[in-house]
Amino acid sequence: VSYTHKIGENVLKDCKDVRYIGMCCSLYSEASSNVDLAYARARGIKVTGIRDYGDAGVAEYVTANLIRRLGGDDGFPPLFGEISEITGVRVGILGMGASAKAVAAGLAAFHADIRYYSRTRKPELEEEKGYRYQELPDLLRECDVICSCLSKNVVLLGEEEFQIMGPGKVLFNTALSPCFEEEAIKKWLDQENTWYFCDTLMGLGDESLLKNNHAVCLKRSSGMTRQAVERLNQKVLDNLGNYCMEQKAL
């Protein structure tokens, strides 16, 4: 089952013989899952997901587009008015899961100043990598670039948050849903020198955003590279094999 297909109670109740669902995508929580996990659990259906297969492509997508924006290589004036390196650019990352860690590592390799906001602090990353935790308002106010790597259906940015961000900023969203309220981002994009990049249409939000030439959507998952598909396939098969072995042992 891919993340593009919703498998709810209305589907599962007509599939009397289903005992196992192997998700070909990440499985973080009931709220973000496209499979009705509560109903599956009540029916005794085992559901497995996979992780850590497409993070490298996401990091490359963010890094490549930021380099173009800082250098003005996309046909618009550079973000800071003159050509800039990533060195010293203040990057605020929302969330600190696997893809966020990959983005942070990629940008840190170019000497970006990495800050992050997460529901739980990551002291080991702060000590080992030198990343800095900030509360959301401070991060939005101080950072030049905001990267949302949040779980699906998590919304953190409303009108107040975009007012704090102000102009002269870049927002990346690589989540599978918008991380913002749609009217709020439209108002923000009406300001001078504001930029929004996302990879999937699921993460874009209202497609009318693309009427603004400062909103750019790749229209495909940046993480689904050739190598990522190979990793995904192997992990799905491993999960299925483990399930079959468990059933054989019963």
Q: What does each model-identified segment do?
A:
Residues 109-127:
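NAD(P)-binding Rossmann-fold cofactor-contacting core
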Residues 106-107, 165:
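Aromatic pocket-lining residues of Rossmann-like dinucleotide-binding sites
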Residues 41, 46-60, 75-76, 80, ...:
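C-terminal helix-to-coil terminal segments
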Residues 72-103:
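Glycine-rich NAD(P)-binding loop of Rossmann-like domains
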Residues 15-20, 45, 127-135, 209-219:
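Active-site regions of enzymes building and remodeling cell-envelope glycoconjugates
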Residues 1-74:
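Phosphate/diphosphate ligand-binding glycine-rich loop within oxidoreductases
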Residues 15-20, 42-45, 111-112, 167-169, ...:
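A short helix->loop->beta-strand "cap" motif at the edges of active sites that frequently abuts
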Residues 5-11, 121-208:
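Rossmann-like adenosine-cofactor binding region
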